[in-house]
Structure formats: structure tokens, C-alpha cells
Amino acid sequence: MEDDDFSIKDKKENYETCSTETISSYISINEKCQLIEKDINDDNHENPYMIFNKISSSLIAMLQGVEVLCNLSIIYLLKDNYHLHPASLSIVMCFIKIPWSIKLVWAVISDNYPIFGYRRKYYLLLGSFLCILSLICLGLITHNNLFITILLLFIYFFGSSLCNVIGEAQVVESNRNCSINSSARNVSLFFAFRKLSFAIMSYLSGYLLLLISKKHIFLIGSFLPICVFTSGFFIIEKRNYTKSSIKDQIKCIYSIIKLSYLKNFIIFIFIMMSTPSCGNTLFFYITNELKFSPNLLGKMAMFQSLASFISIISYMLFFTKIDIRKLLLYSTIIITPFCLLPLVVIKKVNYFLFIPNTLFFITDTVLIEFIAEFQTMPILVLCSRLIPEGFESTIYSLLLSSNNFASIISSFLSSLLTYSLNITSTNFTNLPYMIIICCLTNIIPIFFLYILPNHSQKKNLQHSNSHTQKYYSYPSTDYISSQKSDSSEITKFSADMQIDDITLE
């Protein structure tokens, strides 16, 4: 499809123009529903996506960089101040990131319970305020109580996850009237800003640890949440969203995710991200055994983030049209051998190749990160186009929550594997076996690629039109009603507009 997905003005067919209330009534009677097409007046076309919204979403994208800035400080704090072992560290890191695994809860709340008539603004202010409060407290208290430290970290990750829900909803809303290329550009730019902040913060995280204390880094990290908090006051958003009952919302969510293409994406994302990893265990090996300095670790993380950034830009420019099955298959096949490369350092084979440990680890992590980013971007782009209007936070957060929940499962499996192999902060005898096991489990997602749609299966999604339509109109009575909306819109429905026009290119 060469024309924009939502622009079909040049078609010869007649459209019946009606209000959103009429559409809702029509849907309740007629099971052969058609997809809604919204034609926004030119003079208001820029209103939902004003520059302030773009600045806000960009700052939210960069907010996760604060986590990267403080990540080494957090790990060293738990490792040195509280003397946690690798398995215990993995469990603590899992616990404090639980808010990210249940982002769906925050999304449902923000979609259904607007604060003072706004679904985005005040939730963003609340989340950024919690980030500011927790980071300032972490920078001021004396760290001699593990419970208080974990609680403050938990509050920070809760605030950042809430901000992230709002930022992702803004990105999805900006994709509402875009072609597949524009959607790929919007999503790619959002994550490119995130990875760029990762690269900057990764370098600073190691460099600053050599100059200042961990508590000072927490205080410095509060600057970006302050910027996000300030930007929240300038968000352009329509008011008068009515409250929807949680029961009705859950019914709608359940009916939406029963659609095969959404359900299969959730299953595949979970399988792909739930395999065990040896990342935290390798951290203990390279710090305790290889004596890597914090500055070097920061540089490694910086190169890793730069690789992700370049990968995202490359995907945006060259790979948006590649079939998702082929992309995931080839990337998995390519990345699997690189997962075994740490064995070369552990067995000291690299000395025979005259490659130092530092260069070897940096090269390995950069290559893995570059290829791995190709596995996530097409899924994120496609998911952002499958989401019905009014469910921007809920469904996108559901899809990404499966990613975060799978990461927690991965951490628990990694902890269990670390414990069963008797790997400690000083005993790395069985580390090669753990690396091999983790590498083999990376192949598992290949066997589930068949559940994802390919180009030849696009037309098979057309039967989902009648099921999807009512969720496109579910919140529209109050969201785009001519009586309650701040913008002037014309709502139309088209009998020949197909589901693949908005989901797959």
C-alpha cells in the first residue's frame, strides 16, 4: 500500500458521515462492522502532536537513562555496602523492577481514571515527582539499612514506569494517522532518544564513580526527572474524558488480546525474553576476577548503548520493509555464536590470539547489542499500529509488560541456575556451563516464529475487522464527540477499509 494508511480521500466510494454516538449504536446492532476512519480538519491536525508533546515524550524516553546512570552505583551499593552475592543481587534487582512488569496496571488506571480531566498530564507529574523524591533521598541518607534502600529504589522504578507508560501512549497517539514508514520513524526516534541517553549516561556512570561518591550520583540523576516534571505542565491534551469502569475495560482488553495477532505477539515476546541470562554473574567475574574498573564498565555500557542507537537508526532507514519472521530468524542465528564468546576469555584462549580481555569484552557486547536491537524494533513498531484508539496506554503497556515480566522470570531462572551451579562471587568454576546453557536457550524462540504473521498472511487478518471495530469506538463517544472534544473532527466509517491497512505493510 503506497498511500498513507489512514488517508483514503481519493477513493470513489461514498462514506456515511455520522456522530460517534450513531456509530456506537450501529455497532451494537450490526455485526458486520467496518473500521472507523477519522478525518481531522487541517487547522487542527497539529494540535494533538504539538511541539510540547514531542519534547515531553523525548524527555520521557531519556528518563530511563537515569537508571543507566545510577545502575553501576546501585550494583556497587548492593555489592559493597550490603555484601550481596550474585544470586541475592539478582533477586533484589528483580524485586525493585516489579513496577515495570506490571505497567499494565498503571496503564489501565491512566486510561480509565483521568485526574482533573486529563489522562496523561497529572500521571506524568506524579511519576516524575516520585523519581525526584526517591533519588534525592538515596543521595542524602546513610546506606546502612537494606530495607530502606530497596524501598527507595522500588519507589523510583515505580515512578519511572508510570512516566514511561505516559510517554509510550504519546508515541502511539502520534502514530494514529501515520503510514507504516511514519510509524516506524516515530517509534524509532523515541527509542533512539532513549539509547542516546543510555550511551551518555553509561559513560558518565563509570567516569563519575571515580570522581564522586555513589550518593552524589543519585543527586545528579534527579536533574532529568525535574525536566520531565516541568514538561508535564506544558502537555497539550484534550479534557473531559469520562471515567470507564474497570470491569468494562477488562472485558474489552480480554476481547482485544484474544485476537490472534495480538495474542501471538504477547506469547512470542514472553518466550523470547524469559530465557536465562548470565549478565549479572559475568559482572561479578569481570569485577572480581578480571578487575575491570568502574570507568571501563561505564565505557563498555556506553559502546553498548551506541550500538543500540546505530541499530535503531539503521532499522529506521533500511529495514522497515523486511518480513519480521526473517528478521528474527537471521538475527537469532547470528547472535547465538556471540553468546559463547565469553568462554574464550574464561578459558584464556584470547591470549593466544593476542586480544586483551577489555577489547574482547567490548567487541562482544557491542556486536550482541547491535544485533539484538533488530529483534525488538519491528515488534515494537508493529505493536504500536495494532492498538485501538483510547487504549494507547493499556494495550501497549500490556505488550511491553509481557517483556518486563519475562525479564523478571529470566532473572529468577538465572538466579536458580547460578545457585544450582554453585557459582559465587569468588567461585567461577562452573561459569562456562552456565554460559553454554544460556546460549542454547536463546535458540528456543526460533521454534515459535510460526505464530507471527508474515507478508503472505496479511489478508488473513481481515476477519478481525468486526472484532476490532468496537474497540476503536469504545471510548470515542466522549473522546471525539463533537460536543465534548476540543478539536473539530469528522468521524466516518468505510466498508472497504481493511485491517491490514492499519496493522501490516
UniProtKB/Swiss-Prot annotation:
Regulation (activators, inhibitors): Transport of folates is inhibited by probenecid and methotrexate.
Domain of life, per lineage: Eukaryota
Keyword Transport appears in the UniProt entry: yes
Residues carrying covalently attached carbohydrate according to the record: N177, N181, N186, N240, N427, N454
Catalytic reaction list: folate(in) + H(+)(in) = folate(out) + H(+)(out)
CDD domains (UniProt xref): MFS_FBT (cd17484)
Membrane topology listed for this record: Multi-pass membrane protein
Subcellular compartments: Cell membrane
Annotated GO MF terms: folic acid transmembrane transporter activity
GO cellular component, one term: plasma membrane
Disulfide bonds: none
Chain segments annotated as transmembrane: 58-78, 89-109, 122-142, 146-166, 192-212, 216-236, 266-286, 300-320, 326-346, 352-372, 405-425, 431-451
Annotated keywords: Cell membrane, Glycoprotein, Membrane, Transmembrane, Transmembrane helix, Transport
Function per UniProt: Folate transporter with broad substrate specificity. Transports folic acid, folinic acid, pteroic acid, dihydropteroic acid, the folate precursor p-amino benzoic acid (pABA) and the human folate catabolite pABA monoglutamate.
Family: Belongs to the major facilitator superfamily. Folate-biopterin transporter (TC 2.A.71) family.
Name by which UniProt lists this protein: Folate transporter 1
Organism: Plasmodium falciparum (isolate 3D7)
Taxonomic classification: Eukaryota, Sar, Alveolata, Apicomplexa, Aconoidasida
